[in-house]
Amino acid sequence: MTALTPPQHEAELLQRAKSIAGLTFAELAEELNLVVPPDLKRDKGWVGMLIETALGATAGSKAEQDFSHLGIELKTIPVNQQGYPLETTFVSLAPLAQNSGVTWHSSHVRYKLSKVLWIPIEGERQIPLAERHVGVPILWQPSSSQEQRLRQDWEELMDYIVLGKLTEITARIGEVLQLRPKGANSRALTKGIGKNGEIIDTLPLGFYLRKEFTAEILHDFLMD
């Protein structure tokens, strides 16, 4: 099995995802002629790349959904032995400038979360990378109450950005979404709005889903 062509429809994508559930990273990598790194210190995106390759993801840019022709975003989610998420989930970069007129309905966060294929993966560090397993896929769309909670957080956080209150933003704001610096290092600056409306240099910020929210998604699936 080499890199696959993009799935033509949702059922085909889900079938592919189910077919790799239960495999170890080593088994899946061997099928795809990929080499498993010893760890993720230098290859942070390797697991995502492995799953994307196996499923035939197409997004050349992070701005698009991974399966944009199907309207589906792909997210791997590292979990512990109890199935609880081990980390927050990156959604998209926040628009720190040129953001007038942006609404929840036209936002990148809503676009990215409109339909998500979650792939839980074993993430505990004591398990060697090659021996970690791929989990059962979950195809998810936010319920009306989940979307309402996402929207409330997004609107509150965007108010901070638009009103030039970047220095007041902390990871504690938001019930299900949070804003955190997103960049390889503190030298990777971008343009934002200062408190007097001036353009300033600032750290890029990303929207992240809190672990409690993704845990709820996984729990709801298991209860079905």
UniProtKB/Swiss-Prot annotation:
HAMAP family: MutH. Keywords: Cytoplasm, DNA damage, DNA repair, Endonuclease, Hydrolase, Nuclease. It is found in: Cytoplasm. Belongs to the MutH family. Signal peptide: none annotated. GO terms for biological process: DNA modification; mismatch repair. SUPFAM superfamilies: Restriction endonuclease-like. Coiled coil: none annotated. The keyword Cell wall biogenesis/degradation does not apply. This is DNA mismatch repair protein MutH. CDD domains: MutH-like. The keyword Signal does not apply. GO terms for molecular function: DNA binding; endonuclease activity. GO terms for cellular component: cytoplasm. Its main location: cytoplasm. NCBIfam families: mutH_TIGR, PRK05070.1. It comes from the Bacteria. Pfam families: MutH. It comes from Histophilus somni (strain 2336). Sequence-specific endonuclease that cleaves unmethylated GATC sequences. It is involved in DNA mismatch repair.
